[in-house]
A protein has these predicted regions:
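Helix-centered, glycine/charged polyanion-binding patches within enzymatic domains
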Residues: 32-37, 242-243, 248-323, 327
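Charged, often Cys/His-bearing segments associated with DNA-binding zinc-finger transcription factors
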Residues: 14-61, 68, 347-354
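A positively charged, amphipathic N-terminal helix/segment that binds anionic biomolecules
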Residues: 51-65, 70-76, 85-101
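Short Gly/Pro-enriched turn/cap motifs at secondary-structure boundaries
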Residues: 3, 196-200, 295-296
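Polybasic low-complexity intrinsically disordered regions
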Residues: 18, 26-37, 83, 92, ...
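Structural motif
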Residues: 76-83, 198, 320-329
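Single conserved hydrophobic/aromatic residue that forms the stacking wall/gate
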Residues: 1-15
């Protein structure tokens, strides 16, 4: 027999309250068990290790100071998510190559990510995709990733990790979707086609200027893929370098109008065919030795690209247009610099703590 209850009565109301309270307590107990189990596990995953290192090397206060004047104060409507929490979510997106929706799912699924962001799912949910989209639009509107990139580099320079005596310049291709099967029935008009070797690419280029001593990126620009590397060189110099190292694709740079008057020594790789055609003698041996030395210095420019493409999984453009993608590149290379300087920064952090 089903017992019907008038929930307006004191007895049934108290029973309902007891039931609801018991269920909440049970849920909280279940969550605490999972958190205890997570905290008690012995093995530290690579993700936990990386997030722990980034917790220490990211100059949080400096970056937050740069963003605070632009972040909504929440005087009307729903209170905004805290700025530091939003920045942490945004960094997770860059580190792991996630979409806006993917970040929300990853934080919900991963206790390590929730700990890094500071979210307790028993009290709140992860920031949704729309919230992250609005934050990205804020960064784009005020060109704030360029500011964050500069702030990170200023911190690295202040700690003696960026010498600015020499620059290595290089570029990498970033493919864009070539298909016209979209709402506009057209490809991105700001992206272009170029040929490298025997293969054609459609997309853009990321050009970087790298400190020849540390291998850290000091300048970032973005162009369409068909723009020649040599034409962007002048924009990759900070003005304080005395030596510039370039591969053979930059041959003739010293003759270009935009670099006239710059007090630098150009170290451009000799083309392989020219070196190969030389007579085998002592002079060629000297040239070979010199080219190997230049190549060993230029090799440092590959390290930022390695972190970008293999660690951050950024191998193709994420958005339409050069501006939005260049905005992201500034943030990505700022974070790349922190990864490259990680060991030295952690050592300095340990010295400061002792």
């Amino acid at each position: 027999e089903i017992i019907k209850c008038d929930w307006s009565s004191d007895v049934c109301s108290s029973d309902l309250f007891f039931f609801q309270t018991s269920m909440k307590a049970f849920a909280m107990q279940q969550i605490s068990f999972s958190q205890m189990e997570y905290a008690g596990k012995k093995r530290v995953t690579s993700r936990e290790r990386f997030l722990g290192e980034m917790e220490q090397v990211v100059p949080w206060s400096v970056l937050l100071d740069a963003l605070t004047p632009y972040y909504p104060k929440g005087k009307r409507g729903r209170p905004p998510i805290g700025l530091e929490r939003m920045l942490r979510v945004y960094f997770i997106q860059q580190w792991y190559g996630l979409s806006d929706e993917g970040v929300e799912d990853a934080i919900t699924d991963s206790q390590a990510l929730r700990n890094f962001v500071g979210i307790d799912l028993s009290r709140e949910s992860a920031p949704d995709a729309t919230t992250l989209l609005q934050f990205r639009h804020l960064l784009e509107k005020h060109d704030l990733t360029r500011t964050l990139f500069a702030r990170i580099n200023a911190q690295l320079e202040a700690q003696g990790l960026m010498m600015k005596e020499g620059t290595i310049a290089d570029a990498t291709l970033l493919p864009a979707p070539p298909s016209t099967k979209n709402e506009e029935k057209a490809r991105d008009p700001e992206m272009h086609q170029t040929k490298k070797g025997n293969q054609w690419y459609f997309g853009m280029k990321a050009h970087i200027g790298v400190d020849s001593q540390s291998g850290l990126v000091h300048t970032v620009t973005g162009t369409a893929a068909h723009v020649g590397d040599v034409t962007e060189t002048a924009n990759l110099l900070h003005g304080e370098e005395t030596d510039v190292f370039l591969d053979a694709g930059y041959t003739g740079i010293e003759k270009r109008e935009e670099v006239q008057g710059k007090q630098v020594t150009w170290h451009v790789a000799m083309k392989r065919g020219k070196l190969k055609a030389m007579v085998e003698d002592k002079l060629k041996a000297l040239y070979v030795k010199r080219e190997r030395l230049k190549a060993s210095i230029r090799a440092k420019v590959e390290h930022p690209f390695h972190v970008l493409k293999n660690l951050f999984h950024y191998r193709k453009v994420r958005y339409k247009g050069l501006f939005k993608n260049t905005v992201q590149l500034h943030m990505l290379f700022g974070l790349v610099n922190l990864v490259l300087a990680k060991k030295k920064l952690l050592a300095l952090h340990a010295q400061g703590a002792s």
